[in-house]
Every structure is written in C-alpha cells, then in structure tokens.
Amino acid sequence: MEDAGLLLIRIMIGVVFLFYGTQKLFGWFGGYGIKGTGQWFESIGVKPGNVAAALSGLGELVSGILFILGVFLPLGAAIITIIMLGAIVKVHGAKGFANGAGGFEYNLVLIAVSIGVALIGSGAYALHF
C-alpha cells in the first residue's frame, strides 16, 4: 500500500508542477507564457524577467516529469525547493503564513512533500534504471 500512496503523491506533485511550468513556458491553462510571465517577474524586481520565466518554467516542467516518472527525485525536490523558496522570498513571504491571504503555507507544503518523497524514495511504481 505504501507504494500506491507514494505513486499518488508523486503524480499529484508532478501534475501541479507540470501545470505551472506549461503556464509559464507556453501560456497554457490561462498562463501568460514566457513574455507575460517575464513582464510580471520584472514588475516584482526579478530581472531579466524573460530569463527568470524560462528557467522557472523549465524547472517546474522538468521537476514535474521527474516526480511523475519517479526518477531522480532528489534533483526534482531540489528544483522544487529552489523555485518555492524564490516564490516565498519575492511574493508570498510578506503576506504571512496563511494561504488564503496569499501567504507561504502552500509553498512550504510543496517543499516538505517533495523533500519527504525524495528521502523515502519513489516506491515500486516508478521507472527504475
């Protein structure tokens, strides 16, 4: 049963990061693509915005794929942690803890779950090399 639980968690984390990565990179699912996301990054002081948008979008896309496949989880968790810490520092930290107020609660959950899964391992239902 633990393997099924790990698979469920991995898929959910993967889908979340695939979603946000494709928003930033391609403008899918109501996203703004690299240009629009880059402009937003510039507006919060992250420059060059287009580079930040491309790197964060690519990091989200790659980490999402790694988690879904269950491979290189420490790398995927490190990417997620870096991106989420950036989001806390630049966007959510000043708004406090509560997610409902735009705070960093959700970011911390994503960090903790991704690191936790990386420490436990992918389980039986994953690609194994």
Curated annotation (Swiss-Prot):
GO cellular component, one term: plasma membrane
Bilayer-crossing regions: 11-31, 65-85, 109-129
Membrane topology designation: Multi-pass membrane protein
Chain segments annotated as coiled-coil in the UniProt record: none
Subcellular location: Cell membrane
The keyword Membrane is assigned to this record: yes
Top-level taxon: Bacteria
Entry EC number(s): 1.-.-.-
Entry-linked InterPro entries: DoxX (IPR032808), DoxX-like_oxidoreductase (IPR051907)
Keyword terms, alphabetized: Aromatic hydrocarbons catabolism, Cell membrane, Detoxification, Membrane, Oxidoreductase, Transmembrane, Transmembrane helix
A Gene Ontology BP annotation from the UniProt entry: response to toxic substance
Induction: Repressed by MhqR. Strongly induced by stress due to exposure to 2-methylhydroquinone (2-MHQ) and less strongly induced after diamide or catechol stress. Not induced by oxidative stress due to hydrogen peroxide or methylglyoxal.
GO terms for MF: oxidoreductase activity
Role this protein plays: Putative oxidoreductase that may contribute to the degradation of aromatic compounds.
Family from the record: Belongs to the DoxX family.
Protein name: Putative oxidoreductase MhqP
Organism: Bacillus subtilis (strain 168)
